[in-house]
């Protein structure tokens, strides 16, 4: 099964954190590296799924927000990944977002579903969520817990609706925030994991930071997480997410 993975570029190099490539391979899939000059329609026809990886901030200016704390942005990269995301989504391919990937998907969802802006809010900055800068912790170490739905995150068959607590790493400062009384949000968007970390007491009474969400009924299925499972080697997460598509690929090959 071929999983697309967009890569970044400098003036002289294309590059991607090798942890993403190893993550896809360890789950039993074939990574397909996609550079920004690729023909999106052609390349997506050869894919079985897409991972939108972490990276630099999504440029808030494009979405009508002031840039108050994003020191590195790349509007061309943003546009390429937006186009790639929608091409896969409209082809009903499963899309898995990681960190920046979650942020880009959430912003595109809010544009397409303006009614969701009443209970979802994109923050251009939140504190206490970048362990590399604030705590000098390596990427593969966990730094805080999130509450999560095991059913939505891992496809657990357990009937219990009680959230589980899982430790995660954290390397971001842009964030999606939801009103507590409103989650899960709508029929398409479901909050999968959340935390109050980074919120002051008054904010935490009414809101939570969205650490993971799923979207259905908007093209291919979508799951996005704010942490970095590729560094934690959580292969079960993407194996479960892409398993349905893998069955289709195998069936079509018979």
Functional labels for PLM-detected ranges:
Residues 100-102:
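Active-site loop->helix "elbow" adjoining a glycine-rich segment at hydrolase catalytic centers
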Residues 1-98, 107, 111-173, 177-218, ...:
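N-terminal beta1-alpha1 cap of cysteine-dependent amidohydrolase-like domains
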